[in-house]
Amino acid sequence: MKLALVSAEAYPFSKTGGLGDVVGSLFKEFIKAGIDVTLFLPFYKITRDNFSNSVVNAEIVYGAPIGLNTLFGAVRVAKVSVDSDDNLIIEPSKKGNLFFIEHNNFFDRNELYGTNHGEYLDNAERFVFFSRAVLEICKIMNLNFDVIHCHDWHTALIPLYLKTLYRECSCFEKTKTVLTVHNLGYQGIFPREKLELTGFGQEMFHIDGLEFYGMVNFLKGGLFNADIITTVSPTYAKEILTPDYGAGLDGVLRKRKENLVGIINGIDYKIWNPEEDPFIAKKYGLQNINDKQKNKEDLIALAGINSSLQDPIIAFIGRMVYQKGIDIVVDAMPNLIKNGISFIFEGTGESYYEHKIRELQNSYPSKVFAFIGFDEALAHKIYAGADSLLVPSRYEPCGLSQLIAMRYGTIPICRKTGGLSDTVEDKVTGFLFSEYSSSALTHAISRFIEIYNNKQKFLEMIREAMKRDFSWSNSSKKYIELYRGLIGERERKTGTI
């Protein structure tokens, strides 16, 4: 099986969030599984700064059509393998499996998608170029992939291109496509005049094409044309079929529901491993869970809060934004603090909520610690030292923080939505609540405190949480099964098996 992954980002080469983690982890797992996999990425400034010595110019001449113009770019190539210690080995090679699409006007910028002032105004041009460049390179190099797996709106035009502008290309004759929607809230919506950039005319501006309330929607093109659509949890796959979660595309998704699959994300068990974590005060695992208390001591000292080892510490790590439920956390905190609970925050977000968290820290300096920013070492210390983690999201396609928390025996308290429903078992590995309100969150925290005060039951819950396997090894196998099913279906239809 020959597989291509096409994404706007992948760790460690480029990353702004969960998309980069997912694609980077899948690439690594597929290499380990012996899959013939190639990854296509833009050659961003941050990639050039960190990996310029690991790539070689492929010396391929190609032109990517953008509207009436053809723009030319370069390709940088590297060979990626995984050593016995699970580390990526990245070496320059023209026969590599990592292709970087280079175009300085589009990708040589400080940020991937935009600045604090907003998205880059030419994002449509940038990712049309990237998508067309990938396909043009495949043509020139005669790269015959069995499956091209696209990720999010940035590459969602590729399935549409393969069924239209590139349908006569022999190298794509047998290619199947998968499109993963990591978060339906991001769709690549642009003004109507951007349509011509895609290579399509007004014939594509209709309800079953790219038209979306008078605008152009890149993701919609992929949803209609990918052979399989995946999203990042089974529950989220069901939720997005409804108007409440479908972000205007629920009708399209209902038409494709027979081809829609939810696969839970994983976490990197090498990075997130309390038995080997270099950032935490005391390493621990299932065999020495009590050593987790040493990390609680360390966290109390670091945060400068007035809390004993017997007092519960509840953490929040992530974006301080409306979608993540920070508003109901802020509303619930004063009464909870009065009951002896301490809170630890790490993250950034909307200035209003950052200000609210700082206000709470100033009002309750002995019970609230907030780090407005992100520090990797601190995140590890919080996961290891806190007793519980809040994930009260309005919606959550999958969520990674609750998976990391369980890995560290830190009990998640989550709203029952999306991947949180699929990964946290109420009263077994964590606590779930349904209603989106500060009172429902407070009640869930009260249920947690009840178990927390029963040390035997609390220890049992920690053990159950730490036993769960959310490694990428598990998740990647489901994707491989999906690809093989697509290839088998193709071969049955063509009579080759």
From Swiss-Prot:
Single biological process term from Gene Ontology: glycogen biosynthetic process
Keyword Coiled coil: no
SUPFAM superfamilies: UDP-Glycosyltransferase/glycogen phosphorylase
EC number: 2.4.1.21
Gene3D superfamilies registered for this protein in UniProt: Glycogen Phosphorylase B
Pathway(s) per entry: Glycan biosynthesis; glycogen biosynthesis
Keywords, alphabetical: Glycogen biosynthesis, Glycosyltransferase, Transferase
GO MF terms held by the record: alpha-1,4-glucan glucosyltransferase (ADP-glucose donor) activity; alpha-1,4-glucan glucosyltransferase (UDP-glucose donor) activity
Binding residues annotated for ADP-alpha-D-glucose, in chain numbering: 15
Matching InterPro entries: Glyco_trans_1, GS/SS, Starch_synth_cat_dom
Catalytic reaction equation(s): [(1->4)-alpha-D-glucosyl](n) + ADP-alpha-D-glucose = [(1->4)-alpha-D-glucosyl](n+1) + ADP + H(+)
Nucleotide-binding listed as a keyword: no
Known function: Synthesizes alpha-1,4-glucan chains using ADP-glucose.
Family recorded in the similarity comment: Belongs to the glycosyltransferase 1 family. Bacterial/plant glycogen synthase subfamily.
HAMAP family from the UniProt entry: Glycogen_synth
Official protein name in the record: Glycogen synthase
Species name: Thermodesulfovibrio yellowstonii (strain ATCC 51303 / DSM 11347 / YP87)
Gene that produces this protein: glgA
